[in-house]
Amino acid sequence: MHLENDNHRFMNIMKTERDLQGEGGGGTLGNLSTSTTSVDIDRLDQFKGSNDFILVEENNRSSTTQAIKSWAKRKVNSACTRKMLHRRVPILNWLPKYDSSCAVGDLVAGITVGLTVIPQALAYSNIAGLPAQYGLYSSFLGCFVYIIFGSCKDVPMGPTAIAALLTYQAVNSKGPAHAILLCFLTGILQVLMGFFGLGFLIDFVSGPVSSGFTSAVALIIITSQIKDVLGISASGATFVDTWRSLFKDIHNTRTWDTVFGVACIAVLLIMRLITKVKVGPSDTDTPPSKFHTVVNKFFWLIGTSRNAILVVVCGFIGYSFCANGEPPFRVIGYVPPGLPTVQPPPFSHTTNNNGTVESEDLLDMMADLSSGIIVIPLIGLLEDIAICKAFANGKAVDATQELIAVGLSNIANSFVQGFPGAGSLSRSAVNNSSGVRTPLGGLYTGILVILALLFFTPYFYYIPKSTLAAIIIAAVIFMVEVKVVKPMWRTKKSDLIPGVATFIACLVLPLEYGILIGIGINLMFILYHAARPKISVEKLTSHEGVEYLMLTPDRCLIFPSVDYVRNLVTKHSIRQGIPVVIDCSHIYGADYTAATVIEILTQDFAARDQPLFFYNLKPSVSSVFEGLSPKEFVVYYNHEDIDELLRNKSCIKKQILNV
């Protein structure tokens, strides 16, 4: 609040004082009751008001350019501190404290996650519509980068089912070049969002919208893998299109693929249950014996490594059939051996379409990727933050740092021909239960993937496609969040609306439109909530027996809500015909529209000769209202002052009474 406005306010107080006391009055409001604190206007520094009142003296206003320079200087200075360096490069915090116990925990967890990510990477590349090797290419370099910049020890960077499906819909059969460029652009956008502190954007994705989106994605992924379980060819951009394509080709179902796929799903679900088997005393107070501990660890290891075990066993079966001739089921086929070539992502692309050479530059490729460039970074962040919160154990999650870490990991992956990735919730659970201590566990995961690329790719040829489809289906079926419906129904039924709308929209429309619809519905709920504040109405009586109406809004006055509040105030004031007090204790902000409506409201009350007072109005809000100089605008801060105000309502023009 500027000095000019305060001087104007003191002049009004002086004028009001003379009206109350006459020309011979002194420097105080002598007519007021003893419970009201006096106001000395002789000296500015003796002004005493509400405890919330802050007077700021500012003789020289900085120009816009100077303000920007000052802001930039503060940002640069804060970015160049040791604290900021440790915040943006978290490895500097935990590496000096690293010891042998951490090394053992990270080694066990890293190898366990590596055994999980290799079959998943092969399967997720199928979801993305890419050859199998691209899933492995996406699974090692990002792990190394996340070790340096990642802030959560449980996050294993790599391909995920959701990112793979979004990549498939964005690339739309354009080929690996577009997927690699998408990975690079995703990383660039995530780093920029982190630099500008835009991690808060995920706050607009509520729990119901996230649950609806995740459940729809799970069903779409399951549907996309049914074709490999049945051994048929089917495709589709949406859930409905895929099912239509499946029914069209259902008569070509291959028996061996179907039997093999269904059997693999059953085995995986059974092996998943093995992790929950506990041998030993059921009494929690009795510690298990060493034998029981070893057996439980063995069961846990078998259940956790189920994907790798199944791939090895089915690979041997596939090899046996191939050695004796053509296998009765479809296999992955040739996977190029060795590490990928380290090179920049493709910024142009040339294709040979039936003898016609077609060239695309960067802008053409970006146009092909369309909204995927925006959606995939946000969804990747949403996945990553969900993991960080799940395993944070009450610690704060730095969304900005996670944006930077995941973005740099995706940029690195694009240089080794990877497609977009993020933190995987299933692998994070494995990582956490394996006893990971620091992000260095990703080192062993990445090394295991590199070893697989160097030495085991010839054996991937024999893995049945139905086995990989079974791995995906058995994993994502638990992503369908049916369990959240009942709690939503019990707590707030209206939350089901954005959740169900997102779920249906994602199934019928492309995923990016589905989640935008969900967010849009959420924002409508928020805006409606802001536009319809709750107002309590009380009919009270002052100490002197004068009745008045107390109206208490429960939130800020901003443009969507002010007309609604004005109509309610007018309605109740006309109906009762007594003085009105608006309790502003919960009003922490206002805008120009609110000031305009308050001005009209005071004019209406003055025209009806009906007193209107504002109680406990924050000085910052009061200055907004006073900007339009409303008529008979009276603010007070002490309950006892209402008697004096009601007694002197006929002669008060504008004043502020302070505690």
Indicate residue ranges for each PLM-predicted region.
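Transmembrane helical cores of multi-pass ion-transport proteins
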Residues: 2-534
